[in-house]
Amino acid sequence: MVRVKRGNVARKRRKKILALASGYRGAHSVLFRVANQQVMKALRYSYVGRKQKKRIFRRIWISRINAASRLNGISYSQLIHRFKKSNIDLNRKMLSQIAVLDTVAFKTLLNA
């Protein structure tokens, strides 16, 4: 029988997966097969989560802008329309920060 010398490579690969799975409950952090499945699933979730994070933050910014603009008697869609017409180029993240932290500046933006 031919001898295959790959012990170091295989051990290194398994240890890498088990290190990624440390902190998982039960066999998910001890057994290689189960740990490998869980790590692959976790990496998929983290990839999707990074995409969802951007959507979630945009929704938060829009709802904050909407709440602040309605306190001043204008809806969100009308506010964005006004900004587009008067060439005010502020993104939603900046607008929400201004709306939450500096209400006076937000009111002056509404009147512009």
Curated annotation (Swiss-Prot):
Transmembrane segments: none annotated. The keyword Cell inner membrane does not apply. GO terms for cellular component: chloroplast; ribonucleoprotein complex; ribosome. GO terms for molecular function: rRNA binding; structural constituent of ribosome. Gene3D superfamilies: 6.10.160.10, Ribosomal protein L20. The keyword Transport does not apply. Pfam families: Ribosomal_L20. It is found in: Plastid, Chloroplast. Keywords: Chloroplast, Plastid, Ribonucleoprotein, Ribosomal protein, RNA-binding, rRNA-binding. GO terms for biological process: ribosomal large subunit assembly; translation. Binds directly to 23S ribosomal RNA and is necessary for the in vitro assembly process of the 50S ribosomal subunit. It is not involved in the protein synthesizing functions of that subunit. Belongs to the bacterial ribosomal protein bL20 family. NCBIfam families: rplT_bact. This is Large ribosomal subunit protein bL20c. It comes from Phaeodactylum tricornutum (strain CCAP 1055/1). The gene is rpl20.
